[in-house]
Amino acid sequence: MADSNGTITVEELKKLLEQWNLVIGFLFLTWICLLQFAYANRNRFLYIIKLIFLWLLWPVTLACFVLAAVYRINWITGGIAIAMACLVGLMWLSYFIASFRLFARTRSMWSFNPETNILLNVPLHGTILTRPLLESELVIGAVILRGHLRIAGHHLGRCDIKDLPKEITVATSRTLSYYKLGASQRVAGDSGFAAYSRYRIGNYKLNTDHSSSSDNIALLVQ
Protein backbone atom coordinates (compact mmCIF):
# COMPACT_ATOMS: atom_id res chain seq x y z
CA MET A 1 0.00 0.00 0.00
CA ALA A 2 1.13 3.54 -0.68
CA ASP A 3 1.91 5.89 2.19
CA SER A 4 -0.57 8.55 3.20
CA ASN A 5 1.50 11.21 1.41
CA GLY A 6 1.16 9.38 -1.93
CA THR A 7 4.64 7.80 -2.04
CA ILE A 8 5.28 4.09 -2.55
CA THR A 9 7.20 1.78 -0.25
CA VAL A 10 10.50 0.07 -1.05
CA GLU A 11 8.76 -3.29 -1.39
CA GLU A 12 6.27 -1.86 -3.88
CA LEU A 13 9.15 -0.35 -5.85
CA LYS A 14 10.92 -3.73 -5.96
CA LYS A 15 7.76 -5.45 -7.21
CA LEU A 16 7.28 -2.75 -9.83
CA LEU A 17 10.83 -3.22 -11.10
CA GLU A 18 10.42 -7.01 -11.14
CA GLN A 19 7.30 -6.68 -13.30
CA TRP A 20 8.83 -4.19 -15.74
CA ASN A 21 12.44 -5.42 -15.91
CA LEU A 22 11.94 -7.14 -19.27
CA VAL A 23 10.33 -4.07 -20.85
CA ILE A 24 13.01 -1.78 -19.43
CA GLY A 25 15.69 -4.12 -20.79
CA PHE A 26 14.19 -4.01 -24.29
CA LEU A 27 13.96 -0.21 -24.13
CA PHE A 28 17.61 0.10 -23.15
CA LEU A 29 18.64 -2.40 -25.84
CA THR A 30 16.73 -0.38 -28.44
CA TRP A 31 18.43 2.80 -27.30
CA ILE A 32 21.86 1.12 -27.41
CA CYS A 33 21.23 -0.08 -30.98
CA LEU A 34 20.14 3.41 -32.04
CA LEU A 35 23.19 5.05 -30.49
CA GLN A 36 25.65 2.48 -31.83
CA PHE A 37 24.33 1.61 -35.30
CA ALA A 38 21.91 4.37 -36.36
CA TYR A 39 24.04 6.42 -38.75
CA ALA A 40 22.91 7.90 -42.05
CA ASN A 41 25.71 6.18 -43.97
CA ARG A 42 25.26 2.78 -42.27
CA ASN A 43 21.65 1.84 -41.58
CA ARG A 44 19.05 4.23 -42.98
CA PHE A 45 16.12 2.45 -41.27
CA LEU A 46 17.60 2.73 -37.77
CA TYR A 47 18.69 6.28 -38.53
CA ILE A 48 15.13 7.34 -39.36
CA ILE A 49 13.90 5.74 -36.12
CA LYS A 50 16.55 7.66 -34.18
CA LEU A 51 15.47 10.91 -35.82
CA ILE A 52 11.85 10.23 -34.84
CA PHE A 53 12.97 9.69 -31.24
CA LEU A 54 14.92 12.96 -31.31
CA TRP A 55 11.94 14.84 -32.76
CA LEU A 56 9.64 13.44 -30.05
CA LEU A 57 12.06 14.27 -27.24
CA TRP A 58 11.64 18.03 -27.75
CA PRO A 59 7.85 18.27 -27.10
CA VAL A 60 7.97 15.55 -24.42
CA THR A 61 10.76 17.36 -22.55
CA LEU A 62 8.94 20.67 -22.85
CA ALA A 63 5.71 19.07 -21.59
CA CYS A 64 7.55 17.57 -18.60
CA PHE A 65 8.90 20.95 -17.51
CA VAL A 66 5.53 22.64 -18.07
CA LEU A 67 3.77 20.00 -15.95
CA ALA A 68 6.50 20.30 -13.31
CA ALA A 69 5.82 24.04 -13.19
CA VAL A 70 2.04 23.60 -12.99
CA TYR A 71 2.16 20.85 -10.36
CA ARG A 72 5.16 22.23 -8.50
CA ILE A 73 6.35 20.83 -5.19
CA ASN A 74 7.37 24.28 -4.00
CA TRP A 75 8.20 27.65 -5.48
CA ILE A 76 11.88 26.79 -5.93
CA THR A 77 11.23 23.72 -8.06
CA GLY A 78 8.48 25.63 -9.86
CA GLY A 79 10.90 28.42 -10.74
CA ILE A 80 13.50 25.94 -11.98
CA ALA A 81 10.84 24.17 -14.08
CA ILE A 82 9.70 27.47 -15.63
CA ALA A 83 13.30 28.45 -16.44
CA MET A 84 14.01 25.05 -18.02
CA ALA A 85 10.74 25.17 -19.99
CA CYS A 86 11.74 28.57 -21.39
CA LEU A 87 15.22 27.24 -22.25
CA VAL A 88 13.84 24.16 -24.02
CA GLY A 89 11.30 26.33 -25.86
CA LEU A 90 14.04 28.68 -27.09
CA MET A 91 16.22 25.75 -28.17
CA TRP A 92 13.29 24.19 -30.03
CA LEU A 93 12.50 27.52 -31.69
CA SER A 94 16.13 27.98 -32.75
CA TYR A 95 16.07 24.47 -34.27
CA PHE A 96 13.02 25.36 -36.38
CA ILE A 97 14.52 28.69 -37.47
CA ALA A 98 17.79 27.04 -38.54
CA SER A 99 15.90 24.19 -40.26
CA PHE A 100 13.67 26.52 -42.29
CA ARG A 101 16.68 28.65 -43.29
CA LEU A 102 18.49 25.52 -44.42
CA PHE A 103 15.38 24.32 -46.27
CA ALA A 104 15.16 27.68 -48.07
CA ARG A 105 18.78 27.16 -49.13
CA THR A 106 18.61 23.52 -50.24
CA ARG A 107 14.90 22.60 -50.69
CA SER A 108 15.67 19.27 -49.04
CA MET A 109 13.67 17.60 -46.27
CA TRP A 110 16.99 16.63 -44.70
CA SER A 111 17.04 20.26 -43.51
CA PHE A 112 14.78 19.21 -40.63
CA ASN A 113 17.24 16.62 -39.38
CA PRO A 114 17.49 17.24 -35.61
CA GLU A 115 20.94 15.67 -35.42
CA THR A 116 22.81 18.07 -37.71
CA ASN A 117 22.25 21.17 -39.83
CA ILE A 118 25.03 20.41 -42.33
CA LEU A 119 24.02 18.95 -45.70
CA LEU A 120 26.14 17.53 -48.51
CA ASN A 121 24.81 18.24 -52.03
CA VAL A 122 26.09 16.18 -54.96
CA PRO A 123 24.87 16.68 -58.56
CA LEU A 124 24.78 13.24 -60.14
CA HIS A 125 23.05 12.14 -63.36
CA GLY A 126 20.93 15.30 -63.50
CA THR A 127 19.78 15.07 -59.87
CA ILE A 128 21.11 16.79 -56.78
CA LEU A 129 21.53 14.19 -54.03
CA THR A 130 21.46 15.58 -50.49
CA ARG A 131 22.81 13.75 -47.45
CA PRO A 132 23.46 14.83 -43.83
CA LEU A 133 26.97 15.45 -42.52
CA LEU A 134 28.08 15.72 -38.91
CA GLU A 135 30.77 18.30 -39.69
CA SER A 136 32.09 20.38 -42.56
CA GLU A 137 35.57 19.33 -43.64
CA LEU A 138 38.17 21.17 -45.71
CA VAL A 139 38.58 18.07 -47.90
CA ILE A 140 35.87 15.51 -48.73
CA GLY A 141 36.81 12.10 -50.07
CA ALA A 142 35.03 10.20 -52.84
CA VAL A 143 35.48 6.46 -53.38
CA ILE A 144 34.21 4.39 -56.30
CA LEU A 145 34.15 0.68 -55.54
CA ARG A 146 33.11 -1.59 -58.40
CA GLY A 147 31.18 1.26 -59.99
CA HIS A 148 29.38 2.41 -56.82
CA LEU A 149 30.08 5.93 -55.59
CA ARG A 150 30.53 6.86 -51.95
CA ILE A 151 31.16 10.43 -50.83
CA ALA A 152 31.81 11.16 -47.15
CA GLY A 153 30.67 7.59 -46.44
CA HIS A 154 27.29 7.96 -48.18
CA HIS A 155 26.36 5.57 -50.97
CA LEU A 156 25.06 7.68 -53.88
CA GLY A 157 24.59 5.14 -56.68
CA ARG A 158 26.52 3.99 -59.72
CA CYS A 159 29.11 6.30 -61.24
CA ASP A 160 32.28 6.10 -63.29
CA ILE A 161 35.26 8.14 -62.20
CA LYS A 162 35.15 10.18 -65.41
CA ASP A 163 31.55 11.16 -64.61
CA LEU A 164 32.29 12.58 -61.16
CA PRO A 165 30.82 16.09 -60.68
CA LYS A 166 33.34 18.90 -60.94
CA GLU A 167 31.82 20.63 -57.91
CA ILE A 168 29.87 19.65 -54.84
CA THR A 169 28.57 21.84 -52.01
CA VAL A 170 28.04 21.66 -48.27
CA ALA A 171 25.17 23.76 -46.91
CA THR A 172 24.45 25.09 -43.44
CA SER A 173 21.73 27.47 -42.30
CA ARG A 174 24.14 30.39 -42.78
CA THR A 175 26.52 29.46 -45.61
CA LEU A 176 27.08 27.32 -48.69
CA SER A 177 30.59 25.98 -49.28
CA TYR A 178 31.96 25.06 -52.71
CA TYR A 179 34.21 22.02 -53.12
CA LYS A 180 36.19 21.52 -56.34
CA LEU A 181 37.25 18.14 -57.70
CA GLY A 182 40.99 17.81 -57.25
CA ALA A 183 43.10 14.70 -57.59
CA SER A 184 41.40 11.56 -58.89
CA GLN A 185 42.77 8.14 -59.65
CA ARG A 186 41.25 5.12 -61.38
CA VAL A 187 42.06 1.77 -59.80
CA ALA A 188 41.28 -1.62 -61.33
CA GLY A 189 38.80 -0.72 -64.04
CA ASP A 190 35.58 0.53 -62.44
CA SER A 191 37.08 1.53 -59.07
CA GLY A 192 38.94 4.63 -57.99
CA PHE A 193 39.10 7.54 -55.59
CA ALA A 194 39.06 11.33 -55.66
CA ALA A 195 39.22 14.32 -53.34
CA TYR A 196 37.18 17.52 -53.23
CA SER A 197 38.75 20.57 -51.60
CA ARG A 198 36.87 23.63 -50.35
CA TYR A 199 37.74 26.77 -52.26
CA ARG A 200 34.85 29.16 -51.64
CA ILE A 201 32.27 29.86 -48.97
CA GLY A 202 29.50 32.43 -48.82
CA ASN A 203 25.82 33.21 -48.47
CA TYR A 204 24.62 31.17 -51.45
CA LYS A 205 21.46 29.28 -52.33
CA LEU A 206 21.48 25.86 -53.95
CA ASN A 207 20.30 25.93 -57.56
CA THR A 208 17.72 23.16 -57.81
CA ASP A 209 17.09 23.73 -61.53
CA HIS A 210 18.32 20.39 -62.86
CA SER A 211 18.10 21.60 -66.46
CA SER A 212 21.14 23.80 -65.89
CA SER A 213 24.72 22.61 -65.91
CA SER A 214 25.61 20.26 -63.09
CA ASP A 215 28.72 22.31 -62.45
CA ASN A 216 26.63 25.40 -61.64
CA ILE A 217 24.76 24.23 -58.57
CA ALA A 218 24.64 27.36 -56.44
CA LEU A 219 23.29 30.89 -56.76
CA LEU A 220 24.27 33.94 -54.76
CA VAL A 221 21.60 35.01 -52.28
CA GLN A 222 20.99 38.71 -52.76
UniProtKB/Swiss-Prot annotation:
Residues 37-44, 106-222 are intravirion. GO terms for biological process: symbiont-mediated suppression of host cytoplasmic pattern recognition receptor signaling pathway via inhibition of MAVS activity. InterPro entries: M_CoV (IPR002574), M_SARS-like-CoV (IPR044361). Keywords: Glycoprotein, Host Golgi apparatus, Host membrane, Host-virus interaction, Membrane, Transmembrane, Transmembrane helix, Viral envelope protein, Viral immunoevasion, Viral matrix protein, Virion. GO terms for cellular component: host cell Golgi membrane; plasma membrane; viral envelope; virion membrane. It is found in: Virion membrane; Host Golgi apparatus membrane; Host membrane. CDD domains: SARS-like-CoV_M. Glycans are attached at residue 5. Changing residue 3 to N: In strain: Omicron/BA.5, Omicron/BQ.1.1. One of its GO terms (molecular function) is structural constituent of virion. The chain crosses the membrane at residues 17-36, 45-70, 76-105. It comes from the Viruses. Glycosylated at N-terminus by host. It is a multi-pass membrane protein. Residues 2-16, 71-75 are virion surface. Component of the viral envelope that plays a central role in virus morphogenesis and assembly via its interactions with other viral proteins. Regulates the localization of S protein at cis-Golgi, the place of virus budding. May act by binding cytoplasmic c-terminus of S. Homomultimer. Interacts with envelope E protein in the budding compartment of the host cell, which is located between endoplasmic reticulum and the Golgi complex. Forms a complex with S proteins. Interacts with nucleocapsid N protein. This interaction probably participates in RNA packaging into the virus. Interacts with the accessory proteins 3a and 7a. Belongs to the betacoronaviruses M protein family. This is Membrane protein. The lineage of its organism: Viruses, Riboviria, Orthornavirae, Pisuviricota, Pisoniviricetes.
